[in-house]
Amino acid sequence: MIELFVIKETEWLELVTESVSLEGQRYQAPRSITAKIITKQGTHSYYSVSEGDTVLFKWKGKELFRGIVFSRNPEEHWMTFTAYDMLQYLVKNKDVYVFSNQRADEIIKRLARDFQIPTTSIANTGYTIKSLVFKDDTSLYDMILKALKQTKSQTGRNYQLYSAKGKLGLRAWPDLSEVWVLETGVNITGYQYSTSINDTATKVKLRRQKDNKTYTATASDSSGISKYGVLQYVETVSDNINQAQLQERAKVKQAQKKGVKKELKSIQAIGIPDLQSGLPIYISIPEVGVKKTYWIDTDKHEFKGSTHTMTIDVVEKNSIPDGVSS
């Protein structure tokens, strides 16, 4: 059952709640809830919330979220509000910084200290970053992601920012040793699955201009050409690379763009409270030949009365998306 509280200095006040939506996205801080509460019934008024209040959400006695109210939509008898966890302060705050000879965890602690963000356990990331400079105003979140990205490139280890009981933390990314299973006929209630060759390339051509000369490199998928015809992808490369590197890049690009593209999304299922973006999940949908482990990219949990449902999107690899702190 839903338990939603507003936390005051000396007490927790329970809110009369109709529904709660809890959601998050991998590498997109923070997690949030949107709740609909009853504030008035007849002549009787119930507890409400204001911007800046701390709210706590429990489901069947287990805390799933604690965060700060950032927006409200009050009506005559009810109110909808949205609250964010502590990672919101990493997104909202920007500044310029120069870090020298510091680990990613030390950078996190410094930023948290400077911006008065309470912390819980911060894992030692091990690798010392020689220099990290942000000359333009940059969000604290992007600074940290860049530090974590450099750490992964040097150590191969992934780390995850999280918020627990109103405090910012850092932990090693959960591994694949134990995963939840979603399966049609058991707990999956719906999904969208599609296949397409709209973005497939059976031939890749890369060009590079240098000293008024054009250098080209090509790679092709002969079996793909036989099956789908010639579908050529062309790109002009601006990097300062030699012919051998250009050819290697063409081969890599061809490998990325070959074959039928398969997309699995909007997986609807019976709710599992522990599932959230960034976690591994094994999905079995024999009807379309899917039996493998994915990573949860987005999650949205809906709670109403005694019912809990969820919708997730998944990705095959837990890599930092292009354009994120690159």
UniProtKB/Swiss-Prot annotation:
It holds the Pfam family YQBQ. To B.subtilis XkdQ. It comes from the Bacteria. InterPro entries: Bact_Kbp (IPR052196), YQBQ-like_dom (IPR056937). This is Uncharacterized protein YqbQ. SUPFAM superfamilies: Phage tail proteins.
